Amino acid sequence: MHVTLVEINVHEDKVDEFIEVFRQNHLGSVQEEGNLRFDVLQDPEVNSRFYIYEAYKDEDAVAFHKTTPHYKTSVAKLESLMTGPRKKRLFNGLMP
């Protein structure tokens, strides 16, 4: 299992817009055949910080995800909402 934890920091006045943009990515991602989990989390202490927990069955599923319209649209719209680049950490999922 391929797991990615992504940290996304957005401008404080763009929080609602981020949530709507990412909702579309979430709804599309959970429909992908190789997707096992796609959680969107908001930091309770920093309202403009989000974490995305993505689990895919393998690298091929991740590669497919990055070709989807919902992913490409989301990434394009995120650039103007973020305070800096996304931070990604990769994990091997052992016990889901």
Swiss-Prot record:
| Compartments where located | Cytoplasm
Give the Pfam families listed for this entry.
ABM
Domain ABM positions:
2-91
Return the broad EC class: isomerase
Which InterPro entries does the record match to this protein? ABM_dom, AI-2_Isomerase_LsrG, Dimeric_a/b-barrel, LsrG
Please give the chief subcellular localization of this protein. cytoplasm
- Give the enzyme's EC designation: 5.3.1.32
Q: Which terms does the record give in the GO molecular function aspect?
A: (4S)-4-hydroxy-5-phosphonooxypentane-2,3-dione isomerase activity; oxidoreductase activity
- Kindly indicate whether the keyword Isomerase belongs to this entry: yes
Q: Which PROSITE patterns match?
A: ABM
| Gene Ontology annotations for the cellular component aspect, listed alphabetically | cytosol
The UniProt keywords, alphabetically, are:
Cytoplasm, Isomerase
Q: Which SUPFAM superfamilies match?
A: Dimeric alpha+beta barrel (SSF54909)
Per the record, what are the reactions this protein catalyses?
Answer: (2S)-2-hydroxy-3,4-dioxopentyl phosphate = 3-hydroxy-2,4-dioxopentyl phosphate
Q: Which HAMAP family match?
A: LsrG
Q: What exactly does this protein do? A: Involved in the degradation of phospho-AI-2, thereby terminating induction of the lsr operon and closing the AI-2 signaling cycle. Catalyzes the conversion of (4S)-4-hydroxy-5-phosphonooxypentane-2,3-dione (P-DPD) to 3-hydroxy-5-phosphonooxypentane-2,4-dione (P-HPD).
Matching entries from NCBIfam families are given as: PRK10486.1 (NF007791)
Its assembly, as annotated, is: Homodimer.
The entry sums up its family as follows: Belongs to the LsrG family.
What's the protein called, per UniProt?
Answer: (4S)-4-hydroxy-5-phosphonooxypentane-2,3-dione isomerase
High-level lineage: Bacteria, Pseudomonadati, Pseudomonadota, Gammaproteobacteria, Enterobacterales
